[in-house]
C-alpha cells in the first residue's frame, strides 16, 4: 500500500497554502494525502478545490477568547482528539504533518496516542502555541524563519506554490515594462480593513503622473466599499475580494503593500518583490512584526506600524519607491535572495522517511 499522510492545517491561508504546497509535493511522489481541518476555515474551500479530501473536526481557537470558552476547552479538546483518532484510523495514515493553527493540537496528540510519527512545520517567526506544545512529541520539526524557537527546529523556509517559484527573476520581469508603476495591495487571505480604508486616500493625493496602477485584494466583505472609495477618488483600480492566481499577481507587480503573514513573506521572497509591510497589530505574540523584520533587515521591505497610520504617512513612504525603479529592483532582488525554494520538497521527503516501516 502507498504511503499515506494526514496534514492538519486550518484557519487562514497562512496555514493552508503552505500545507497545499507540501501536499502537492507528496502527491507528485505517489503519496496519498488527506487533510484534517475545520468546516469554517479557508481549508473548507481551498482543500477540496485542489482535489484533496478534507476531514473536519469540531475545534475552535482559545487564545484571546472569553472565560466561558476556556471553561469549555477541556471537553472540546478531548472531543477533537477522539475525532482525530477516528480520522487517523479511517484514513490509515502512516504520518501526521501539523502545519500550525489550533486544529494541529488535537490531531498531533491523536497521532502520538496511536504511535504515528508526527512532523511539524512552524510558518511564523514566533512559534504558535500548538507547535510549542507538540514539538517534544514530534519526530521532525521544521521552521519557516531562522529565528523561530522550537526544540530541534530545522530552518527550511516556508513551502510556496511552485508557480510562484517559477516566476522570472525581478530583472527579467521589470526590464521592458512601460507605463505606470504596478502596486499590488493585499491584506492576506482575509483582507485588511486598514489597507482598504487608507490606500485610496493616500493615492488620491498624487498626481496622475506619479500614481501607480492598482491591483487590490480586499477580503470577502470589503470589495464593494473599496471599489466605491477608489471611484470617489477617481482612481481606476482592479479590486477583488480574493486573488486566486497569486503567481499572476506577484508577477504583474513592481511593488507590494501588504500584511506580513508568513505565507505572504514567503511568496514575496519566492517571487522577488519588495514591499511595504503593515503587520496585523493583534496577531498572537505580535508574530507578523517579527515576520516583517526578516525582510526589512534583508533590505527588501519597510515595515510600518498600523497604529497612527494615515494617508499622508503612507503617501510619503510610497512616493520615493514609485519614483525610483532602481530602488524597487534592489528591494526585489534582496527579497529573492531570501527565498528557500526547496521547503515543500524537504518537508515532503521527511514525511516519506518517517512513514517507512509504519503499518497503519
UniProtKB/Swiss-Prot annotation:
It is an enzyme of class 2 (transferase). Its EC number is 2.4.1.227. It comes from the Bacteria. UDP-N-acetyl-alpha-D-glucosamine binds at residues 12-14, 124, 161, 189, 243, 288. It catalyses: di-trans,octa-cis-undecaprenyl diphospho-N-acetyl-alpha-D-muramoyl-L-alanyl-D-glutamyl-meso-2,6-diaminopimeloyl-D-alanyl-D-alanine + UDP-N-acetyl-alpha-D-glucosamine = di-trans,octa-cis-undecaprenyl diphospho-[N-acetyl-alpha-D-glucosaminyl-(1->4)]-N-acetyl-alpha-D-muramoyl-L-alanyl-D-glutamyl-meso-2,6-diaminopimeloyl-D-alanyl-D-alanine + UDP + H(+). GO terms for molecular function: UDP-N-acetyl-D-glucosamine:N-acetylmuramoyl-L-alanyl-D-glutamyl-meso-2,6-diaminopimelyl-D-alanyl-D-alanine-diphosphoundecaprenol 4-beta-N-acetylglucosaminlytransferase activity; undecaprenyldiphospho-muramoylpentapeptide beta-N-acetylglucosaminyltransferase activity. It is found in: Cell inner membrane. Keywords: Cell cycle, Cell division, Cell inner membrane, Cell membrane, Cell shape, Cell wall biogenesis/degradation, Glycosyltransferase, Membrane, Peptidoglycan synthesis, Transferase. Pfam families: Glyco_tran_28_C, Glyco_transf_28. GO terms for biological process: carbohydrate metabolic process; cell division; cell wall organization; lipid glycosylation; peptidoglycan biosynthetic process; regulation of cell shape. Belongs to the glycosyltransferase 28 family. MurG subfamily. Cell wall formation. Catalyzes the transfer of a GlcNAc subunit on undecaprenyl-pyrophosphoryl-MurNAc-pentapeptide (lipid intermediate I) to form undecaprenyl-pyrophosphoryl-MurNAc-(pentapeptide)GlcNAc (lipid intermediate II). NCBIfam families: murG. PANTHER family: GLYCOSYLTRANSFERASE, UDP-N-ACETYLGLUCOSAMINE--N-ACETYLMURAMYL-(PENTAPEPTIDE) PYROPHOSPHORYL-UNDECAPRENOL N-ACETYLGLUCOSAMINE TRANSFERASE 1. This is UDP-N-acetylglucosamine--N-acetylmuramyl-(pentapeptide) pyrophosphoryl-undecaprenol N-acetylglucosamine transferase.
Amino acid at each position: 500500500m502507498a504511503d499515506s499522510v494526514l496534514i492538519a492545517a486550518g484557519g487562514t491561508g497562512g496555514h493552508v497554502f503552505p500545507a497545499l504546497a507540501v501536499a502537492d509535493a507528496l502527491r507528485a511522489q505517489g503519496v496519498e494525502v488527506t487533510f484534517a481541518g475545520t468546516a469554517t476555515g479557508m481549508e473548507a474551500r481551498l482543500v477540496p478545490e485542489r482535489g484533496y479530501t478534507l476531514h473536519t473536526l469540531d475545534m475552535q481557537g482559545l487564545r484571546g477568547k472569553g472565560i466561558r470558552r476556556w471553561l469549555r476547552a477541556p471537553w472540546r479538546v478531548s472531543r477533537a482528539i477522539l475525532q482525530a483518532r477516528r480520522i487517523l484510523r479511517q484514513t490509515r495514515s502512516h504520518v501526521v504533518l501539523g502545519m500550525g493553527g489550533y486544529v494541529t493540537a488535537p490531531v498531533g496528540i491523536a497521532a502520538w496516542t496511536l504511535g504515528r510519527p508526527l512532523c511539524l512545520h512552524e510558518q511564523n517567526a514566533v512559534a504558535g502555541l500548538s507547535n510549542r506544545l507538540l514539538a517534544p512529541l514530534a519526530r521532525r520539526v521544521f521552521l519557516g524563519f531562522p529565528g523561530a524557537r522550537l526544540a530541534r527546529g530545522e530552518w527550511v523556509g516556508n513551502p510556496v506554490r511552485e508557480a510562484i517559484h517559477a516566476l522570472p527573476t525581478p530583472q527579467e520581469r521589470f526590464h521592458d515594462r512601460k507605463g505606470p508603476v504596478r502596486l499590488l495591495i493585499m491584506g492576506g487571505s482575509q483582507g485588511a480593513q486598514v489597507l482598504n480604508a487608507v490606500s485610496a486616500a493616500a493615492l488620491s493625493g498624487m498626481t496622475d503622473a506619479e500614481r501607480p496602477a492598482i491591483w487590490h485584494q480586499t477580503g470577502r466583505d470589503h470589495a464593494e466599499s473599496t471599489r466605491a472609495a477608489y471611484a470617489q477618488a477617481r482612481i481606476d483600480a482592479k479590486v477583488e475580494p480574493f486573488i486566486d492566481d497569486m503567481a499572476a499577481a506577484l508577477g504583474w507587480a513592481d511593488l507590494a503593500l501588504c500584511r506580513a503573514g508568513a505565507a505572504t513573506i514567503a511568496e514575496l521572497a519566492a517571487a522577488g518583490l519588495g514591499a511595504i509591510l503593515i503587520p496585523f497589530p493583534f496577531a498572537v505574540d505580535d508574530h507578523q512584526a517579527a515576520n516583517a523584520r526578516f525582510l526589512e533587515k534583508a533590505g527588501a521591505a519597510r515595515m510600518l506600524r498600523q497604529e497612527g497610520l494615515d494617508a499622508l504617512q503612507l503617501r510619503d513612504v510610497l512616493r520615493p519607491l514609485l519614483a525610483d525603479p532602481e530602488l524597487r529592483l534592489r528591494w526585489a532582488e534582496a527579497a529573492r535572495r531570501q527565498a528557500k525554494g526547496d521547503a515543500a520538497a524537504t518537508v515532503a521527503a521527511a514525511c516519506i522517511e518517517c512513514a517507512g516501516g509504519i503499518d497503519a
